[in-house]
Amino acid sequence: MSKSTILAIFMIVLVLGKVTKETQGQEMCRDILMKAKNCDEGTCDTLCKQKWKGNGSCFPNVYTYRKSCLCTFPCKT
């Protein structure tokens, strides 16, 4: 193989390795807020933005028989 072919293969492997590393931090994490209180959509979304810089939505929590706030946000690497 010529030097240019080997260099091209090396560069492709290097670029693919960088792209793979960058996309690993894109995973989403979750946290449940307002377990003791009944969830309000506006309050839930505001709390999530303040605490995690994420989005919040209410869901029926079968363990507390109330609506809880589910906060979804990008995981930190």
UniProtKB/Swiss-Prot annotation:
Q: Tell me the leader sequence span.
A: 1-25
- Asked if the keyword Signal belongs to this entry, the reply reads yes
Tell where it localizes. Answer: Secreted
What are the GO cellular component annotations? Answer: extracellular region
Which InterPro entries does this entry report, sorted A to Z?
A: DEFL
Record's keyword terms, sorted: Antimicrobial, Disulfide bond, Fungicide, Plant defense, Secreted, Signal
**UniProt keyword Cell inner membrane present:** no
**GO:BP terms for this protein?**
defense response to fungus; killing of cells of another organism
> Which cysteines share a disulfide bond?
C29-C75, C39-C58, C44-C69, C48-C71
Question: Which Pfam families would you find in this protein's record?
Answer: SLR1-BP (PF07333)
The entry assigns this protein to a family as follows:
Belongs to the DEFL family.
Output this protein's name: Putative defensin-like protein 118
